[in-house]
């Protein structure tokens, strides 16, 4: 299996970040990749509010990632934010593509070097 890693910088706009996913997924497909991995916060970069963009796994952002994967016949792993408890979010990886549909919620949050993921992310 050939895979691609898209080490990109996402911004604050989830729609613009979908454009990045589409762009780099197309490039990965052109190189013969069957799977492309995006960063954990590709939906919206850390450092911006997260609870206002969190959505369930069947929401429009995740469905657009599914559509990109389906149209390219490519497995995509992309980090998004889903609703957590008490107004927080979950740091979720969506894995979608031909023959696969699953997700993973991060459980070991990064609280070090002045960054406290646990202040806004639920584990």
Annotate each language-model stretch with its function.
Residues 3, 17, 25-54, 69, ...:
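Active-site beta-strand/loop signature of hydrolases that rely on acidic residues for catalysis
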Residues 1-12, 92, 103-105:
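Active-site-proximal beta-strand elements of phosphoester/diester hydrolases
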Residues 9, 42, 81-82, 109:
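Catalytic metal-binding/acid-base residues of hydrolase active sites
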Residues 7-24, 58:
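N-terminal phosphate-binding loop and adjacent alpha-helix
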Residues 12-15, 53-57, 112-116:
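Short, flexible loop segments at the rims of nucleotide/cofactor-binding pockets, characterized by
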Residues 21, 56-62, 119-121:
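Charged helix-capping and loop-helix junction motifs
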Residues 58-84:
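A short, hydrophobic beta-strand-centered structural micro-motif
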Residues 63, 67, 84-123:
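Active-site catalytic loop in hydrolytic enzyme cores
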């Amino acid at each position: 299996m050939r895979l691609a890693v898209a080490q990109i910088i996402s911004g604050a706009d989830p729609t613009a970040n979908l454009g990045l996913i589409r762009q780099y997924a197309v490039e990965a497909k052109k190189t013969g990749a069957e799977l492309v991995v995006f960063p954990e916060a590709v939906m919206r970069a850390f450092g911006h509010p997260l609870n206002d963009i969190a959505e369930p796994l069947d929401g429009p952002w995740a469905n657009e990632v599914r559509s990109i994967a389906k149209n390219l016949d490519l497995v995509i792993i992309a980090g998004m934010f889903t609703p957590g408890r008490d107004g927080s979010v979950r740091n979720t990886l969506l894995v979608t593509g031909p023959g696969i549909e699953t997700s993973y919620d991060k459980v070991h949050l990064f609280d070090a070097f002045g960054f406290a993921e646990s202040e806004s992310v639920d584990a």
